[in-house]
Amino acid sequence: MIGGILAQTLSGQTILGSESLVANFLSPDLWTIVVGLLGGRIGRDSAGDTLAEVDFLPLLLWWSVIAAIGAALAARRIRQRQQTSWGDALMSVGFACGWWWLMGMWELARLSAFVIGWESVEQFLLATPQFFQATALAGWLVQPFAFRCGEQRMESGEQHQNHSATQTSHSALLSILVSRRSALKSVTALIAVYVVTFTAMNWRLWFNLRVPHGDSAMYEEHLWNLWHGQGFRSYLDQGLFLGEHLQVIHLLLLPLHLIWPSHLLLELCESTALALGAIPIFRMTRRSTGSAHAGLLMSAAYLLYFPLHFLDIEIDLKTFRPESFCVPFFLFAFEALELGQLRRTLILLAIALSAKEDYSIIIAPLGVWIAATAWFQKRANPHPLPPGEDGHRPGEGSVAPSDAIPESSAIRVPHTSPLPPGESERGSRRRILTGLCLTVFGVLYLLLATRVVIPWFRGGAELHYVRYFSKFGDTMGEVVWNMLTKPRLLWGELLTVKTVLYALSMLLPVGFVALLSPGRLAVALPLFGILCLNELAADPRHHFHAPLVPVVFWASAIGVSNAGRCVSRLRSCLPLWLHPPTTASQTADSFARQFVWASAFTSGLFLSLSPAGIAFWDVGSPMSLWRLYAHDPRADQFPKVFAKVPREARVASTDFVHPRFTHHERSYDYSHYRRQIAGYEDRVPDDTSFIVIDTRHPYSDVKSPGEVRELQTEPDRWELLPDDTDGYFIVLRRRPSGS
């Protein structure tokens, strides 16, 4: 414990002393407050950089108090659950502080990299203290309980052998039913909390005029224009939206939109859809581990997973993306696949693919995985069980549900009879054929979409997202060819600190347990590689990583059941004197199940924009409650503007008020972006009758009427309406022709 406290103290001095390092945890305002509370001082060095000096003893006292309070609470919990002595309980808790040595290792590695001059390693370490801290805290939180649970489970298993088989079977069945029902209720409650929380955040951003039209509210305009006969488009697009993406999944919301035509509906549906992904995760984990409690913990990890939060609200506050709907459909498809329900799998995959054309880059490798798995299973077991028939994954034997019966004993689920040899042979061939067809389909669909369909809707122009890969060329053909023929350029862009950070951001919040099912996780590798090469956003704070999330949790739901088996295999490979304890497998299983949710929670503390993250409550953070969700006076002034613009008007408006005019006759973007509808010139379309400018939005470059482009270039064509908004908005009306 003492060593862990010292490690946290020494690394804490380094982090709190550097403005760039502490930015991974706190805003400058909160940093100033924390340094002051610790009796430290903030100043500048000779180069003008802001530094802080924090004394060793106050920080040591702070971490000692945290360790003492944590030890007391954990020991009390252990004694209540396991009827052990204070000494044994405190010993378990003391060992848990060994996880804090990770911060000492980070500090030592950072100093070593600096002394040696290994710049890439130093750069990586300077960018990752929050990841090391999240892992250290997660291990500290769950280690005492995992260790004691492993021992208790072994003891309970030994005692259980003295009971009669009939009694065991009856009590086991009853316990399983009660456990599953209770866990499912808890999952439902967690889903409800997520939906309420994120819907409230999204709606508050909308009412505060914080939601942009581009790449967010424009999708509601698609639905409005479609059922008003103006086509599947917004007027940001050069034509129909199919010239941007083969993305039609949000049309599933059209029946609801007919009843409630509002962007708020889309926000509610997106948050609900993302939250519902917890259901297949719960069921897959429960089946793979035999434990409803493990399923509950994995579902909690999913809902705490900070990359999921950024699918609901992106870092640039784009609050609705159709891409998010792929997450639940992929997860339900993976669950159906684990159950051997191929027809249902294909239907769900087709719906997920409608979220974006490049999600075929998930479907093609998934087909390879299905075919390869079926082929290897056929070779290993010529008479396999029916997929999912025994409640477990295809091709695997029965798994002892080691904690389905109040986390205590191991009851083996009986095998069912295998299929007749001919039937199983046909089943294997069918899965191999299905996998190969999926692979071919994925490749052909991507080629057809990107080389034929989308260019046709764009009038032959190149895809807009080719510019995200400008280092490889200016056209899709050049990009692909250079990736294939210039390996040095390709690997030079892939093997970077940025790629490692991206991988850490996806895997660390699930405690790396997804790596315990490497075949499933590999399904995401091709798309992950492409995302690492794009120059726009190579981190999971936008929407590009949406299809990676379901793959990570599919692999985690299955991989979490492999922890004990991995330890057993390791034990068999080691010499006798290096063997871990006999309880190591049970401890590893218990630890993995708890480490997942703890990792999601602690990483979210430093990286999530939700109320589970520090940034939400940090007064100096740009993502804080006080900056984004508190009352905004712009919202009070806007109704005065809206009342001046008739519904039949054709309106050009700035991005953050643009969503309020999408139900007018026409709704155009007012910016310096040159669009087809304005003849690719820096002006509004000719039929624009009103211009509305928000002078106080975050990116406004127009603060007063004298800066308005139209009043400078065409003052005789535009009339400036009287301002009754205290300068928050500028409204122009086109003068009648001839006046």
Short names for language-model regions:
Residues 3-15, 197, 201, 432-516, ...:
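Membrane-lumen/periplasm interface segments of specific transmembrane helices
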Residues 1-3, 64-69, 77-99, 119-155, ...:
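Start-transfer (signal-anchor) and selected internal transmembrane alpha helices
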Residues 272-309, 327-328, 342-347, 593:
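Transmembrane-helix signature of polytopic, membrane-embedded enzymes
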Residues 280, 316, 322-348, 373, ...:
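Specific aromatic-rich, kink-prone transmembrane helix
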Residues 217-241, 248-249:
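Extracytosolic helix-loop segments that constitute the early lumenal/periplasmic catalytic or substrate-binding loops
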Residues 92-98, 185-192, 439-443, 563-613:
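Signature aromatic-anchored transmembrane alpha helix within multi-pass, membrane-resident enzymes
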Residues 160, 362-386, 397-411, 424-443:
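Perimembrane helix-loop-helix junctions
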Residues 118-136, 361, 521-571:
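Hydrophobic/aromatic-rich transmembrane helices and adjacent perimembrane loops
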